[in-house]
Amino acid sequence: MRAFTRIAVVLLLVPGLVRAQSRPAADTLAASLQSRYQGIKDFTADFVHTYRGGVLRTQTQERGTVMVKRPGRMRWVYSAPERKEFVADGRKIYAYIPEDRQVIVSVVPADDQATTPALFLAGKGDISRDFTAAYADSPDPGTVSLKLTPRKEEPEYEYLIVTIDPVTLQIRALTTRDRQGGDSTLTFSNLQENRGLADKVFAFLIPRGVEVITDGTSK
């Protein structure tokens, strides 16, 4: 699977205040963010996914919608320029690109092994336990950003930068710095919480005639 596609399932968020002299410690904000999202049952949002840099110094932009339900359920649907889906039903994760006629199946990791931001949103992992937090420059006025560095080295990325609304603590953007020096940014809009999403929304039916890859083995 392409590196940009693999980054897609990597996503999360964090808090802050506008003025440096009045803001709490970064680790305190990280704990507040963890607490806030533990109280959210589900949410939906639109997103724009931009990738810049890396070995080939490329720039790519895609867009779509996301639905998340705790614990462990997600559906990322990319609509443009290419359709693809990433679905977690609580037990397994499915990555499907219709053009490739291929579905890649993996297991949702246990809470203490879930270090990607998307899985935190779905009720997996713990920000304070798994990351060290520090303030970072924020891309937009009226927002605050934190840099989250994993306590254990991750093969896919070096660190995350999460940008939030300092009043509501809602996510506005998430940037992932990958091991090739590229930045993958998810920018969120129209975020709505506690919609009462049904579990069936996160069911994935493998299409007929596609190649299914599980644990690196094709079927």
Task: Go through the PLM ranges and name each one.
Residues A20, I104, D126-G216:
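Gly/Pro-enriched, hydrophobic low-complexity segments
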Residues V10-A20:
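Hydrophobic h-region of N-terminal signal peptides that target proteins for export
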Residues T58-G64, G182:
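Amphipathic hydrophobic-ligand
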Residues Y37, A114-S128:
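Short, solvent-exposed helix-to-loop capping segments enriched in aromatics
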Residues T65-T115, S184-T185:
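An acidic-aromatic
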Residues M1-A8:
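Bacterial N-terminal signal peptides that target proteins for export
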Residues R19-Q59, I206-K219:
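N-terminal leader/targeting segments and the immediate start of mature chains
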